[in-house]
Amino acid sequence: MVLSAADKTNVKGVFAKIGGQAEALGGEALARMFAAYPPTKTYFPHFDLSPGSAQVKAHGKKVASALVEAANNIDDIAGALSKLSDLHAQKLRVDPVNFKLLGHCFLVVVAIHHPSVLTPEVHASLDKFLCAVATVLTAKYR
């Protein structure tokens, strides 16, 4: 998915506005994904998946950090997430659809906490960005 200059500006603007909340939003998005799509829990049998779990928050922080890294390197998302793509494809073997589910949950969390930021145009740009991230993370699945 090709991001236009306007998309890139919109995505960078979202991450600038959510700033220090990205980690909390990542944890909330992950918790929302587990609640809305219970089969995604199968990849985390060793986690305490209860609401507010420190393990879910910690993994949410990793998710948010990866999204921030991708946004900061929006012209080279594949390069920025190459190691993460290798990890998920070769070691963890996460079902690729889960990246799209998590992206959707992240959009929902941003909409809940920052409704004024998520105009229709920004929503579309952020959705395209999250789809691009999902595509990069699944590119090495073969």
From Swiss-Prot:
One of its GO terms (molecular function) is peroxidase activity. It comes from the Eukaryota. One of its GO terms (biological process) is hydrogen peroxide catabolic process. Keywords: Heme, Iron, Metal-binding, Oxygen transport, Transport. PROSITE patterns: GLOBIN. Residues 2-142 form the Globin domain. SUPFAM superfamilies: Globin-like. O2 binds at H59. The keyword Metal-binding applies. Disulfide bonds: none annotated. Heme b binds at H88. Heterotetramer of two alpha chains and two beta chains. Belongs to the globin family. Involved in oxygen transport from the lung to the various peripheral tissues. This is Hemoglobin subunit alpha-A.
